[in-house]
């Protein structure tokens, strides 16, 4: 991870000097993580792909404003967060997973089918703020401070959202896990 941060810092410096190929390499480092993050927020592969393209376009247009290359991951995910929430505002009634079986298919290699359905349903029952905190921490591996930057809220709020969400998930999934392990 440290090597990646050093390499990304070098690429960012090159992009700021006008090296487009360096930005293409930077995209290749981050496109899957950004896409997966957006996919977990939107539940729609097409929207996630479109949003990913918008995220990287905005990142390219604004990378000169990034003062600290070490903050690139949280800066990039902040752009992704903003783009997703902009889409949600435009489509208020449509927010949520369009294909209820999608999450099950994606996680099939991690869980038993029964538990996969239970996890999907439990995540869907979290409010949007809690779900996003879980996605950023559990699925994307961000630290509390980075999530705080991405969501523009205090670290204490991030922790509260995450702990509340995890407690809700634990309580909801305990019966499902007991069924899935039989």
Which sequence ranges carry the predicted segments?
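Arg/Lys-rich amphipathic alpha helix in sigma70-family domain 2
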Residues: 61-68, 78-97, 164, 170
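A short pre-motif secondary-structure segment
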Residues: 133-137
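Residues within the DNA-recognition helix of helix-turn-helix
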Residues: 30, 161-168
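Short, basic/polar amphipathic helix motif occurring as a linker/hinge flanking DNA-binding modules
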Residues: 77, 87-114, 181
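Amphipathic, Lys/Arg- and hydrophobic-enriched alpha-helical face
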Residues: 27-45, 62, 123, 172-175
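Short, charged helix-capping/linker segments at alpha-helix termini
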Residues: 1-3, 16-25, 35-54, 155, ...
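C-terminal edge and immediately downstream basic/flexible tail or linker adjoining helix-turn-helix-like DNA-binding
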Residues: 1-5, 14, 43, 95, ...
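Structural recognition of an alpha-helix C-terminal capping motif at a helix-to-coil junction
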Residues: 36, 50-57, 70-82
């Amino acid at each position: 991870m440290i090597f990646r941060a050093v390499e990304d810092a070098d690429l960012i410096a090159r992009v700021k000097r006008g090296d487009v190929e360096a930005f293409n390499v930077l995209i290749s480092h981050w496109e899957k993580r950004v896409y997966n993050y957006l996919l977990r927020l939107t539940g729609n592969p097409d929207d996630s792909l479109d949003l990913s393209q918008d995220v990287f376009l905005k990142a390219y247009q604004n990378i000169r404003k990034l003062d600290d290359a070490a903050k690139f991951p949280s800066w990039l995910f902040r752009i992704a967060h903003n783009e997703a929430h902009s889409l949600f505002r435009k489509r208020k009634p449509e927010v949520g997973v369009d294909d209820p079986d999608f999450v099950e298919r994606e996680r099939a290699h991690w869980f038993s089918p029964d538990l996969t359905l239970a996890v999907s349903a439990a995540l869907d029952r979290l409010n949007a703020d809690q779900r996003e905190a879980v996605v950023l921490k559990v699925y994307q591996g961000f630290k509390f401070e980075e999530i705080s930057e991405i969501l523009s809220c205090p670290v204490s709020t991030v922790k509260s959202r995450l702990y509340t969400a995890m407690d809700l998930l634990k309580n909801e999934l305990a019966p499902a896990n007991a069924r899935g392990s039989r």
